[in-house]
Amino acid sequence: MGMQGRSFARQIRAYVSLTKPRVVELLLLTTVPTMILAQRGVPNPLSVLSVLLGGAMSAGAAGAFNCYIDRDIDSKMSRTRNRPLVTGALSPKASLIFAWMLCVISVLWFLLFVNWLSALLSAIAVFLYAFFYSIVLKKRTPQNIVWGGLAGCMPVLIAWAAVTGSIDWPAIVLFAVVFLWTPPHYWPLSIHYSEDYRLTSIPMLGAIFPRKLVVLQVLLYAFAVVACTLLLIPVAHMTPLYGLFSAVLGAWFVYEIYRLYVRVVRGHEIKAMHIFSLSNTYLSLVFLSVGIDGVVSQLL
């Protein structure tokens, strides 16, 4: 590969990195199971593909806007100093244009290939993350990721709306599951990178509050998440199979966070990133259970 080819490949990698692909992957993980539950069976594959592509562009646009807005503070944090706007791989102007292009294309995509409600929800999701979280909340309140987490819940509503053309109670419960899951997911991260957040004056809970208090709140939110997953049983008429899965997964999730809390109370060293990673697994398995239940209920 010549110099031009390598340069082009680096540019592509930089633009992909700008979209925060790992976050996109996590958001899309909730999409297919939600569509299966809404359909009470396997939806049209083309419909699923359309929603996944639109969702990837929407989430990618939100990530790109966030990288543009946070480019100054990203340079001060070890976790983010390799992002393309910090390294100079992309210019701020090019990044902003790319973010707007993805945003507009994602909304038009949903409008043309899915429906108007998912297009509207997609636009709201980008606005919530790029403006409400990144500009209004992030530097102002320790509750930033709680309310900023609203954006991360939107793929569930988009997926449900794509199938039904409406927002129903099961979708709202799933929305609440992701909303309540967000603090137990991100606050352990803020504990691990507390020094980074202090250097940038971002008031993340894990950076400015005592660890004992932070982990206690993580534990309380974990109980709330589990309660919400169980609430789905009567609301969405889930089968006993889902009830068993959600109860076992919930007990495991709460137990692991309780173990972390005990270590903090006793003054021991903690590995907060263990809970960060574990929370990803927990949410993945909960939504996998939702998808399985949607297929099983069709067969009963």
From Swiss-Prot:
First-level EC class: transferase
Pathway this chain belongs to: Porphyrin-containing compound metabolism; heme O biosynthesis; heme O from protoheme: step 1/1
The EC number(s) this enzyme carries: 2.5.1.141
Note: Carbon 2 of the heme B porphyrin ring is defined according to the Fischer nomenclature.
GO annotations of cellular component type: plasma membrane
One BP term from GO: heme O biosynthetic process
Cellular location(s): Cell membrane
Protein name: Protoheme IX farnesyltransferase
One Pfam family, short name: UbiA
PROSITE patterns: UBIA
Top-level taxon in the UniProt lineage: Bacteria
Lineage: Bacteria, Bacillati, Actinomycetota, Actinomycetes, Micrococcales
Segments crossing the lipid bilayer: 21-43, 45-65, 94-114, 117-137, 145-167, 171-193, 213-233, 235-255, 272-292
Major location (coarse): membrane
CDD domains: PT_UbiA_Cox10
Family, per entry: Belongs to the UbiA prenyltransferase family. Protoheme IX farnesyltransferase subfamily.
Task of the protein: Converts heme B (protoheme IX) to heme O by substitution of the vinyl group on carbon 2 of heme B porphyrin ring with a hydroxyethyl farnesyl side group.
Topology with respect to the bilayer: Multi-pass membrane protein
GO molecular function: protoheme IX farnesyltransferase activity
Origin species: Tropheryma whipplei (strain Twist)
Catalytic activity: heme b + (2E,6E)-farnesyl diphosphate + H2O = Fe(II)-heme o + diphosphate
